[in-house]
Amino acid sequence: MLKKTFQLKVAALGLSFLLPSLASAACYDDGASARISNYCALDKIQGARVDLRTVQFIDYKLKQEGMQRGLGLSTPVAASTTSKSAYPILSYSDNINGGNSPEPLVLGNLSFDGEKELYRREGVVAGLGASLNGRYIHGEGRYLNYGLNASYAHSPKHGLGIATGSANVSSINHIRNWWFVDAHANTSRVRKDITDDTNSNLSIVTSKVFEPSDNIYSEASFGVNRYFAESYNQNQVLFGYKTIHANSVYSAFNLTVGDAVENQLATKFALSAQLVTQLMNKPLKLSASYSQADGGMLLGFERSDETYNISVSYPLWRGLTASVGYRTTDSTIDYFDMSTPTFEFQFSSYNF
C-alpha cells in the first residue's frame, strides 16, 4: 500500500492532464465497501496524473479508514466523529401485528382454526426513524464503528404500529497487505401488537482485498457468527465475495451455513446476491436471496421452510429511492406458506 501511495503522490504533482473523477466513477460504487473502493481507486490512478479534487477525495476516504497519512495531504480527519439523523418511513408490511395466518392449521387428520383477532394484518405503514452513528479511529487502519437506531411505523388502516430498536458496534482492523480482521456485535428488537422479538449476533470475520485480474477488484471474507434468538442459540459460518468489475458493475455474494438446532426452526443455509449497475447515471440494484430453515417441530410434525426473495431498487429522484420485490415461503406445513409483494420508499435522512 505504501508503494501505491508514493507513486500516486508523484503523479499527482502534475495537474495539467486531468482525469475527471476517474476513481470516483469507476470504484466508489453504491453498495461497495470502503476498503475495496479504496483499493480500486489507488490501483486505477497508479502512474496517472489526476485532478486535485480526485486526490483530495481519495485522501479523505483513506483517512476515514484510519490510514492516517492518506495520500500525504495535510487535511486532517478527526479521530472521533458522530452523526445524528432522522428519516421518514413508508413501506408495505405483510404482518403489521405479528399475527397468524387466517388459514386453518392442518396437521395430519387434525385441523385447528385460529381466533380472528389474532389474524395477521397487512398494509402500508408510515412513520419516522432516528439514528446515532459514530466512529473512533484509535490506530493505523484500526477504528470502532457504533450505532443506535429507533423507529416507529403506524398503519392508519388498522390503527397498529411497529416499533423497532437496534444497536451495533464493530472493531475494524487492517492487519497488513490488505488483510483485515473485524469483530461485530449487534442486537435488535421488533415490537408489534402481538409479538415482541429480540435477536443478537456476535461475529469475527477475516477478509482479504486483492486484484484477481486486471481492472477487477475483489474482497473475499470468511468468519464465524454466534446467533442469539429468544428460544435458542446457533453457531454459523459466514462466507462472502464482493467484486468491482472492469465495467464498474458491483456484485456481492454471501453464504451463511448454520448448525442444526434440536426441535427449533433454524437457518440451515442462506444465500444472497446483489448486483449494482448504472442506469441513466443512477445505481440500479438487483437483489435475490434463498434460505432454508429446518429442525422445527409442531405437535410432533417436522417443519422446514424455504424462502425466496427478489427485489429491485432505483432512485426515482433526488432523495427518494423506490424498492419493489416479491417474497415467497414454502413450508412443509402449509399453514406457514406465504407469498407477498414487497415495496418500500427510502428517503434521504436529515442530519442534525
Where are these regions (language model features)?
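Outer-membrane beta-barrel initiation region
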Residues: A26-N168
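Membrane-embedded beta-strand positions of outer-membrane beta-barrel proteins
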Residues: K84-P88, Y146-L148, W179-A185, I204, ...
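Transmembrane beta-strands of outer-membrane beta-barrel pores
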Residues: P88-D94, Y136, A150-P156, A185-R191, ...
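Residues on the lipid-exposed face of transmembrane beta-strands in outer-membrane beta-barrel proteins
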Residues: P88-L90, A126-Y136, A150-Y152, A167-N173, ...
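Residues that define the transmembrane beta-barrel architecture of outer-membrane proteins
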Residues: E122-L128, G159-G165, D196-L202, S231-V237, ...
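Repeated loop/turn-to-beta-strand initiation elements of outer-membrane beta-barrel proteins
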Residues: I137-N145, H174-A183, F210-A220, H245-F253, ...
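Detector for outer-membrane/organellar transmembrane beta-barrel domains
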Residues: N199-G296
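Outer-membrane beta-barrel "beta-signal"
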Residues: T321, G325, F336-F352
